[in-house]
Amino acid sequence: DRYKSYTEYETARIKADCNSAVSECEERSRKELTDLRAELCKKVFDAAGETINEYTKTDSYSEKLVSSAKEIAEAFDGGDVELFLRKEDLVFSDDLKAIVKNGCVVTESDDIVYGGLRAADRKTHCLADDTLDTKLKEQKEWFLEHSGLSIEE
């Protein structure tokens, strides 16, 4: 009887030790997967950022800014509009102001990294965001949801 109790005790202890070891291994593996996922995501979106930076040097990009300004002018329909651009895009200020009209003001924005424009109607406080930064952020969220890189419990 004593032998049986000892055997049961040792069996339970070994099972507990094994369960603990398995849990530690699963936790370590989950962390490694999370780190790999983050690294892969960073590489993908760093490459996308480089591609966007090259795009902003093209005529297509300046045409896109003009198109955005036209959409904003139409959406804000004669409002008191302030456009926000990154420093590198301030060279387009006069062209964009001419499109939006009505005393449109252009302001440099430090939080626009990749390009595009953001607008605000200074009277109604309505906002429009057509920045490449926001589009990239939305794509990153989509990528994380649909890439199959989710980590299941």
State what each model feature region is.
Residues 1-40, 44, 48-55:
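Long, amphipathic coiled-coil
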